[in-house]
């Protein structure tokens, strides 16, 4: 969770490393931005998300100016969410999150918490089963493949890979690969 401006910068830097790579110069970034690649779009989305989280956690309590900045950041982030057909709640995903293919859209992430260095592909749905409290808790280094889903009050451990088109409705231990309907 972002609690300071330094945290926000760190989160943005880690998201940039995961989505754009480590050796991206300004010229390469501008070329990718002009061409409209998926990695630049994902980086723009996460940069807007991290700035919204900072505004929500730190600036919102600091009077009218903080609330105005929060409203602007929220509007900017929701505009990008609608454009890319991605729904990720604030303060849910850790740093270093990766979206390799954002254009296909249909990504919904509504979990209690998701660890660091996770990734999701097109068509991933992570959410509650019946009530708002029944949402998954996800560890670090978890990869969701194309079309995979996770529902209910479950815990997915660290270093887990979820195969394409799998539906996870039970707890998953650390260091495992899960596939099937239901998994």
Whereabouts are the PLM-identified features?
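Structural signal for interior beta-strand "rungs" in well-ordered beta-sheet cores
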Residues: 82-183
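Terminal amphipathic alpha-helical/low-complexity segments used for targeting or macromolecular assembly
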Residues: 1-84
